[in-house]
Amino acid sequence: MSDFLALAQPGVQKLSPYVPGKPVDELARELGIDPAAIVKLASNENPLGASPKALEAIRAELAELTRYPDGNGFELKRKLAERCAVDAAQVTLGNGSNDILDLVARAYLAPGLNAVFSEHAFAVYPIATQAVGAEGRAVKARAWGHDLEAMLAAIDGQTRVVFVANPNNPTGTWFGADALERFLAQVPAEVLVVLDEAYIEYAEGDELPDGLDYLARHPNLLVSRTFSKAYGLASLRVGYALSSKAVADVLNRVRQPFNVNSLALAAACAALDDHDYLAQSRRLNDSGMAQLEDGFHALGLSWIPSKGNFIAVDLARDAGPVYQALLREGVIVRPVAGYGMPTFLRVSIGLPEENDRFLQALGKVLAHD
């Protein structure tokens, strides 16, 4: 029998499959309990559920499931271009923002080239990089966040892409406008900067720099965003990139046909118009973050301040057994040892009662540790 792993290209041989947050149904089967009794705070999902306007748009689209979607996503691109004050030709749609990251890697990376990203950064950066045979350069973090100066120093003549996230997942750390401006000014023009803003909608006012403000001055900048988080459409898989027309043209040369389905296109268009839902999502996230921080303080735990819809808490011990014990309590969070954070758990912000259930379970587990 052929060794099909050995036949794969070397970069793929070194990869391990991405491990997502544990599904509710899987834990329910393992414990033999009703899925409704389980609290999942593992995947940075919106606890409000989808926007009512998005659900209405999905229902209206169901009669057309026999048809292929608009392969160019004309209406969603138009709405995004209007919202973001760019030309529609600067918008690339993806099957989630993960798809955008993969498109970048396939278009710009190859064996002999490299991509730079931070330690403790999103796992898809190295996966996408190694999958095409390129070298991934993980730069040591500073205070759990991006060390932008060190990342600049890691760039060489074979660097084609730099991945930066603001805020970063799973740490929740962020950098300000001055730091971003200095960084962009020093990145060589032939290196594409991918600014991952998956959680930007949770920022209020000028808490975080808006990547769109830098597009016109930096043609090597691509801003990646998603409808999976604040817009509550994670299962539909729809994300997008905003970039120069030249970069968008390149990405569309490798983009799969019909990569965003009709339901996702319709729901995303409607979600963009549901301003009340987005405002409610922000308010819930702010109050939930405060609730968890207060709970961690009461338990004597430290955490990393976060601008996302999640928070990383330091248990000051191997977090693996605590994670397993929480599962037995019917609570799913995210261990992040694979991100070089073995004493941390990442906890998504949930509804008040979900946050309370988690804190009670955590207190119980720690008391018996």
UniProtKB/Swiss-Prot annotation:
The protein's annotated pathway: Amino-acid biosynthesis; L-histidine biosynthesis; L-histidine from 5-phospho-alpha-D-ribose 1-diphosphate: step 7/9
Any GO MF annotation of the entry: histidinol-phosphate transaminase activity
Gene3D superfamilies per UniProt: Aspartate Aminotransferase, domain 1, Type I PLP-dependent aspartate aminotransferase-like (Major domain)
Cofactor(s) the protein requires to work: pyridoxal 5'-phosphate
Keywords: Amino-acid biosynthesis, Aminotransferase, Histidine biosynthesis, Pyridoxal phosphate, Transferase
UniProt cross-references to CDD domains, sorted A to Z: AAT_like
Keyword flag Lipid metabolism: no
EC number(s) from the headed UniProt entry: 2.6.1.9
Any Pfam family matching the protein: Aminotran_1_2
GO biological process, one term: L-histidine biosynthetic process
N6-(pyridoxal phosphate)lysine PTM sites in chain numbering: 229
Reaction catalysis annotation: L-histidinol phosphate + 2-oxoglutarate = 3-(imidazol-4-yl)-2-oxopropyl phosphate + L-glutamate
Alphabetized SUPFAM superfamilies for the sequence: PLP-dependent transferases
Domain of life where this protein originates: Bacteria
Key word Amino-acid biosynthesis present: yes
Family assignment from sequence similarity: Belongs to the class-II pyridoxal-phosphate-dependent aminotransferase family. Histidinol-phosphate aminotransferase subfamily.
Entries under PANTHER family matching the protein: HISTIDINOL-PHOSPHATE AMINOTRANSFERASE, HISTIDINOL-PHOSPHATE AMINOTRANSFERASE 2
Assembly with partners or alone: Homodimer.
Protein name per Swiss-Prot or TrEMBL: Histidinol-phosphate aminotransferase 2
Species of the source: Pseudomonas aeruginosa (strain ATCC 15692 / DSM 22644 / CIP 104116 / JCM 14847 / LMG 12228 / 1C / PRS 101 / PAO1)
